[in-house]
């Protein structure tokens, strides 16, 4: 009996209790890998400023810390897995939202560099913002990494599909009105009893006035300035 007791006690005492949980350690290692990959993805968002990239990375770090705390506080393997999955999903969403911001910045740069009036640019920028908000809503409401990826892809596609006209509708309409006025004036000149030389001199003035108006219209930045130039 004594021998059996001794053997049993020794066997029990010989069982080593690890200082750390293998399940938790593996989950944290996987989480850190996700963080590294996420930050590399942020660095690829070439349209974002350094400050915007850093803000996205800070959000990733914040979500990772919350996940790590949840992993460390988990009582069961299932709890560990859920905490890790939730953390990875949050990080995926951070990357997706930054990708949307990157697409928005690229499209808005295209709009800014166009020949459109301020009002036309504002309307297009608002359209881009609405598409971005819809995309982010879909991303933030996603419950799986696959759904996040889908929402991100659809959002970027919709933003990139925003058409930026090569010509301003307001400016083209103004030029058309000027051209019609010039045509009417030239017809009146042709119908007059002036000499050919006098007609030619007047038509030259019409052409110069039209060219000046067209130039002013091209350089106008607002609808009001376009109207004034017209």
Feature annotation, model-predicted:
Residues 1-230:
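Amphipathic alpha-helical assembly segments used for oligomerization, scaffolding, or translocation
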């Amino acid at each position: 009996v004594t021998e059996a007791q001794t053997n049993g006690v020794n066997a029990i005492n010989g069982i080593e209790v690890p200082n750390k949980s293998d399940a938790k350690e593996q989950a944290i290692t996987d989480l850190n890998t996700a963080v590294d990959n996420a930050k590399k993805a942020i660095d690829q968002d070439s349209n974002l400023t350094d400050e915007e990239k850093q803000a996205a990375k800070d959000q990733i770090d914040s979500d990772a810390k919350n996940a790590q705390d949840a992993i460390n506080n988990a009582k069961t393997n299932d709890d560990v897995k859920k905490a890790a999955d939730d953390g990875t999903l949050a990080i995926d969403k951070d990357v997706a939202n930054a990708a949307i911001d990157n697409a928005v910045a690229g499209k808005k740069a295209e709009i800014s560099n166009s020949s459109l009036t301020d009002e036309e640019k504002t309307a297009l920028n608002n359209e881009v913002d609405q598409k971005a908000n819809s995309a982010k809503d879909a991303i933030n409401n996603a419950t799986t990494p696959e759904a996040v990826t889908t929402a991100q892809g659809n959002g970027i596609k919709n933003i990139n599909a925003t058409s930026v006209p090569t010509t301003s509708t307001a400016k083209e309409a103004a030029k058309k009105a000027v051209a019609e006025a010039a045509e009417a004036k030239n017809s009146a000149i042709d119908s007059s009893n002036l000499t050919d030389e006098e007609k030619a001199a007047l038509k030259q003035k019409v052409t110069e006035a039209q060219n000046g108006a067209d130039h002013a219209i091209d350089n106008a930045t607002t609808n009001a300035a376009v109207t004034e130039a017209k």
